[in-house]
Amino acid sequence: HVKAIPGADPELVERMGYLADRMSVNLELPTAEGLRTLAPNKHRKNILTPMRQIQNGIHANKEELILYRKSPVFVSGGQSTQMIIGATPETDYQILNVAENLYQKFELKRVFYSAFVKVNEDKSLPALPGGPPLLREHRLYQADWLLRFYGFKAEELLDEKRPFFNVMLDPKEDWAVRHLECFPVEINRA
């Protein structure tokens, strides 16, 4: 697994793609606003450009492999990214929408979520009186699973009126409680 650095030389990204089974470019924060606030030297375009290059490389390589079976494989395991959760004010709904868009537009295999942990006393970093939002991170992983493997859409799980998960309920359980009209289910037809 290789992490491509935003703004990396495209030639290096391509060369690494033939050596690594997976590549990732960390999105860092869910929105461009959050990035401007906490990492003003980083720009969304510099993050998305290598993501697009990796996606295009995977597609081109699939075509090469059809024509030339012995061609080297480019990023066989696909690409992923990571977002820090809780450092900026994005809602779970916004975060899931970002993840959903990344899956659709960049064909990512996985989005990783990392609860923000304050490691120094920089005044620009938010104070988290309750500590890192680990349970929130866990609920986002569970919701992400619903997006990737069960075909849910972010808007089916959350919306503008209800933008955060109830951290006391698994998102699947939360959805079921809000959609009692779908139950009971005949197990042989489910």
For each predicted feature, which ranges?
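Helix-hairpin-helix
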Residues: 172, 178-190
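Conserved AdoMet/S-adenosylmethionine-binding subsite of the radical SAM
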Residues: 1-157
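Long, charged amphipathic helices and adjacent flexible linkers at domain junctions
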Residues: 158-174
